């Protein structure tokens, strides 16, 4: 699932994923968090 968060590194996805899914995990793919 891609979320609308721009990123350059996976670290930027952690807070956003935690907010949306309650799990602090994420990858940065094509400039967006997954």
Curated annotation (Swiss-Prot):
Transmembrane segments: none annotated. It comes from the Eukaryota. The record marks 27 as: Basic residue of the functional dyad. It holds the Pfam family Toxin_2. Keywords: Ion channel impairing toxin, Neurotoxin, Potassium channel impairing toxin, Secreted, Toxin, Voltage-gated potassium channel impairing toxin. GO terms for cellular component: extracellular region. SUPFAM superfamilies: Scorpion toxin-like. It is found in: Secreted. Expressed by the venom gland. One of its GO terms (molecular function) is potassium channel regulator activity. Has the structural arrangement of an alpha-helix connected to a beta-sheet by disulfide bonds (CSalpha/beta). Belongs to the short scorpion toxin superfamily. Potassium channel inhibitor family. Alpha-KTx 02 subfamily. Potent inhibitor of Kv1/KCNA voltage-gated potassium channels. This is Potassium channel toxin alpha-KTx 2.6.
């Amino acid at each position: 699932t891609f979320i609308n968060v721009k990123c350059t590194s996976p670290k930027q996805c952690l807070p956003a994923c935690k907010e949306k899914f309650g799990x602090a995990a994420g990858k940065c793919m094509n400039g967006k968090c997954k």
